[in-house]
């Protein structure tokens, strides 16, 4: 209802689950009209539509061979991300030709063996292709993917990091740094300043 009250014609989403819920369930049920009051658009698709405006900002070469860990369920997202990556100077996009199933990693939770096989085969294909970088699309996937970075000869990032790099922007992936530690005490020690700044209970943080 809040989206509809803005009278906007387009609402952006990042998460494919949200995209499916809003565009296929919530928005169509809001009124009796054939058309929902607004269109839901995945952010990558929105950004690719504005590539002509973005391109002049991509000034720093990113000399990397990049493969994409992607899922086809959110229409147009993979194609949009490839277009965006291909616009980055110096970046070489590498197609791993992997099976395309689901809409993100969590959508394969009911098929754990297929999920693990897809992940393992993607990592091996990326290694065989001698990529420098495996880029994911969704943050939910990144939480799983980044934990494997130390086991492979390539970095694991979100595709937006590569766009930011070409724009001269960088922000450390603290989640990945902590995830790779694989040690609760080390994570607590490294994040002590943030725990204190946000008035968190260290034991609550440990449990989470």
Language model features by range: what are they?
Residues 1-208:
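Iron-sulfur cluster-binding electron-transfer modules in prokaryotic oxidoreductases
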């Amino acid at each position: 209802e809040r989206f509809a009250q803005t009278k906007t014609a387009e609402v952006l989403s990042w998460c494919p689950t949200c995209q499916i819920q809003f565009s296929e369930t919530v928005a169509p049920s809001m009124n009796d009209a054939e058309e929902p009051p607004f269109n839901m658009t995945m952010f990558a698709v929105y950004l690719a539509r504005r590539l002509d405006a973005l391109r002049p900002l991509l000034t720093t070469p990113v000399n990397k061979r990049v493969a994409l860990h992607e899922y086809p369920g959110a229409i147009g997202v993979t194609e949009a991300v490839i277009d965006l990556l291909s616009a980055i100077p110096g970046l070489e996009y590498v197609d791993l030709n992997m099976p395309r199933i689901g809409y993100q990693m969590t959508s394969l939770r009911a098929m754990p063996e297929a999920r693990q096989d897809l992940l393992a085969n993607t990592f091996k294909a990326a290694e065989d292709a001698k990529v420098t970088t495996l880029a994911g699309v969704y943050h939910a996937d990144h939480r799983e993917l980044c934990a494997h970075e130390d086991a492979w000869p390539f970095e694991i990032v979100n595709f937006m990091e590569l766009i930011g790099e070409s724009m001269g922007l960088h922000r450390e992936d603290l989640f990945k740094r902590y995830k790779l530690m694989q040690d609760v005490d080390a994570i607590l020690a490294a994040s002590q300043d943030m725990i204190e700044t946000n008035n968190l209970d260290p034991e609550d943080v440990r449990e989470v």
